[in-house]
Amino acid sequence: MEWRNLPRRARPSKLLLLSLERIGVVDPPEFLYREYDSKATLRCDLMIFVPRSTRYPDVDPWFISTTGFCFPDTYRKAARKALRRLRAIYRHHL
């Protein structure tokens, strides 16, 4: 079970990328995932690492992690979770 980068067929969520760009995150987020079998069920762990914003340098880099059943579902779940976290972290700045 090794961690891998986002596969080429999967593009980062446009809404997430545009939201990050709006708050000054110029480097793209890093996506890492792994798929494995757990009790005969396919599982997927995914992490999104978001770098520091140039517009709000007082906010530290952050990440989210989530677990799902297959990559496409886990990827959508992680993107939604990252958007919620983004809103929570930057609500005092926006």
What are these regions (language model features)?
Residues 60-65:
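Short Trp-Ser/Thr-centered turn/loop motifs at beta-strand boundaries
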Residues 1-58, 69-72, 76, 80-94:
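N-terminal segment of the canonical double-stranded RNA-binding domain
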